[in-house]
Every structure is written in structure tokens, then in C-alpha cells.
Amino acid sequence: MRLLVSGKKDFSEFLNSLARRGESGFAKKEGTVRRILGAVKKDGDAALFRLTREFDGWRPSSRSIRVSPGEIRKAVKLLKEEERDTLEFAAERIEKFHLLQVQKSWSFADEDGTILGQIVHPLERVGIYVPGGKAAYPSSVLMNAIPARVAGVREIIMACPAPKGYLDPVVLAAAHIAGVDAIFKVGGAQAIGAMAYGTQTIPKVDKIVGPGNIYVATAKRMVFGEVAIDSIAGPSEILIISDGSGEPSYIAADLISQAEHDEQAAAVLVCTSRRFAEEVRSEVGKQLDLLPRKTIAGRAL
């Protein structure tokens, strides 16, 4: 992890490069993503299956690309008690939070009898994209599916890349707990295209939500208008500002928690004490040694 001091040349150079790091990413991927989306829109399942073979290394069919009820039951049975408790605890907290955000229809009649108001109607079908190529993200399942369910969305489908046809059981269990209606083993721009346009197997949705890599983000940007989207999320980033009085191990853990998502992630600490910065850097090194995703986090840091 680099240690930079304000006032020196390399400090301003680093800040400028950090600010520009996402500027050209979308443009470089647009051609590839446009071809993928066009193929899925034109050829449906045939293109989807071909792209899945190419990128995820397995041969799906209209039956195997959808997670079966038996696979979900098996995943739930494989959960350790601690994992189940953690997922259910998180799900309960997320639901409580979003219940307070629920909007309701309302109306009133003004002085001349004109009725004014607002009708709040949930979407029919929402598609959730959950990353899964390099790690499992059950939190992404809960944080996207539960708000949709609370809002009253009629049908929630989920797409998640499955290298060699494998999906992490914890992700499947999280989808079960969150009330996801259908899960598809497909990722990347092709998954976004399938949910945006619909195929013979995957239904068209009204809105696509959830994070992903640069190809997923570019695809979401390109299908916006065909469907609604939540946002165009770039690589993970975190900036911590400290006066040097915090706990170095906590700050190191927060930095690593974002750095492990992606080699392109940005994890930055700004503080007024060089001694404290060095303590945090030392702690980052110690914690990295214990991390299964040490290589990815190390590259980001």
C-alpha cells in the first residue's frame, strides 16, 4: 500500500490518476458489449448459451440455466448454523429499514372538488444482477431482493455468473431467504441483455438492479431506456478521513473490505499523522495475509 505525503509531486499525480481512473473504461468496452447485446436481442437463448459456454466454461440448456427447486433446497441444507443466522439477521435488518421507506397512494379534493393525488404502483418484474465470477456476494442478493419484495414487486428474478455451472450455495440460500422467484446461471453483459430484451428462457424485466464489473455496468448503461436501471456503478471505492485517533485495525479492515472486490477498486486513507498512516499500512499487510482473496485486494491496494 502506497504512502504519499501532500506537497510532494507524486501526491498530486496520484490524485489526478485516481480521479481519471474510470473515464475511459466504458468507451473501451462499448464495442464488445454492443455486439453481445445485439446477439442476445437477435438470437435469444442461442446467443445466451453460446456466450455462457465462451465466458463461463459450461454448456447450459434452457433447463439447466435455471436453478431448480432441488438445487435451492440442497443449498439451504448445506448452510452452517452460523451462516443461516447471519443471513436471517441481515435480512431482518434490511427489511425493517426498507419498510419505513414504503410509499403509499394518496389523494385529496380541493376547494372546487378537483381530486388530486398520487398513485404508487409496484413494478411487475425486476431483475437482480449478482456478481459471482471471483467471489460470492450474498449481501448483494439481500440488499436488492428484499427492497423489491417490500415494495410489492410481483416477480423477482436473479442472474448470477456460474463458472463451470457452479453457484455458491450461500448465494442460493440468500436468494431463498430474500424471496427471489427465479435464479438463472448467467452473468456478464449477456445476462443484462437477456433481462432487458427477454429470451425464450429468461423473461424481460421492467428494471435491472445490482452491481457488476465494467462489462455489466456498460451493458446497463446501454439498455437504459429499454428498461429502467438503478445506477451505473463503477469499481468499488472507499475514502476514509482520519485525525489519527481511530483504531488502525478497524480502518485497515474497512479498506480491505472494498479492495477485495476488484483489482480496479480504490481504497484510500487521508489522515493528518504519518505515524498513524504507517500503522494502518502495517495492519493492512497483516490482514491481507489472512485473506482468501489476498491477490485481488493486494493489486487494488
Locate predicted features.
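Conserved NAD(P)+-binding/catalytic subdomain of aldehyde/semialdehyde dehydrogenases
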Residues: 179-266
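N-terminal Rossmann-like NAD(P)+-binding subdomain of aldehyde/semialdehyde dehydrogenases
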Residues: 1-124
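NAD(P)-dependent aldehyde/semialdehyde dehydrogenase
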Residues: 267-301
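Short, solvent-exposed amphipathic alpha-helical segments in soluble enzyme
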Residues: 143-146, 172-175, 200, 224-226, ...
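Conserved small-residue-rich beta-alpha loop and adjacent elements
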Residues: 108-173
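N-terminal small/polar loop signature for handling phosphorylated ligands or for N-terminal nucleophile
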Residues: 168-179, 196
